[in-house]
Amino acid sequence: MKFHFEKILPGPGESFVTEKMTGPTLDCVYHVHPECELTWIESGFGSRFIGDSIEPFSAGDLVLIGGSVPHHYLTLESDSTGPEWSKTCVVKFSPAFCGRTFLELPEFEAVSQMLQEAERGLHFPEESAAEAVPLLQKLFRENGARRLLALLELLELLSRLPRRTLSGSAIRPEAAPDERLNRVLRLIHRRLALGRPIPLAEAAAEACLTPTAFSRYFRRATRKRFIDYVTELKLSRAAGKLARSDRPIVEIAFESGFYNLSNFNRQFQNSRKMTPRAYRNSYRRIDLQHAAP
């Protein structure tokens, strides 16, 4: 699998990178880097792609990925109108940032195990994220040795918190970047933002391949059929809209690229193991719990 390779360069006197990103959208190409990455979404919503996983994200989302895991966060323009911009905190660190024998120490066995699991991507549920975020924010405030100690403290805490894996398997990309794949993905995302269909023939033309050759290429590159990838992305968009609005389900289905409500309900049930209405109600229960004194 080929993706854009990102080179991570810590600043002077630093062994790892911290970044805060603010703007109307998050739109990065599929990329990889040898460093582990911890990403917290302070505000904003969209779709995240970790290995072969496609899921919606919203404020509070906390994900840890291992080195060389293909990933991509996307907020589409139509999802980012108004004052709610995306705010994201990212920490990128080498597993050997404390020395190559660090993870072999018995005191950090749980951390080592967690970083191995992170090769498939790890999502921390809301309760876990809420417990970890204060330490993450502390990390961004510290300097020097205190900054390093804050990262160690954060990783130790995360190793004890509930989490779930995202990708069905660990995916190892090829070293060479593939701009052709990113061109196709940008086309897909633009079309979904406009609510327009994406014919396979047009995607194939963007990649300068015949439809048959493109189908083989896309499946080899993403481990998904083209139609399955597009469907999962549309379902991810629909899930995000269901969670944060009371608009009619049929309207959300149409906006997300499903022009038959029965087909949308069936696809959503197969993907999320619940109906769109039940999915929306599950988020309402969470909101009510948070609103309770």
Question: What are the language-model segments listed below?
Answer:
Residues 6-10, 69-138:
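A hydrophobic/aromatic-rich effector-binding and dimerization subdomain
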Residues 56-73, 151-158:
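Conserved long hydrophobic alpha-helices within structured protein cores
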Residues 47, 54, 197, 246-247, ...:
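Residue at a beta-strand N-cap/secondary-structure junction
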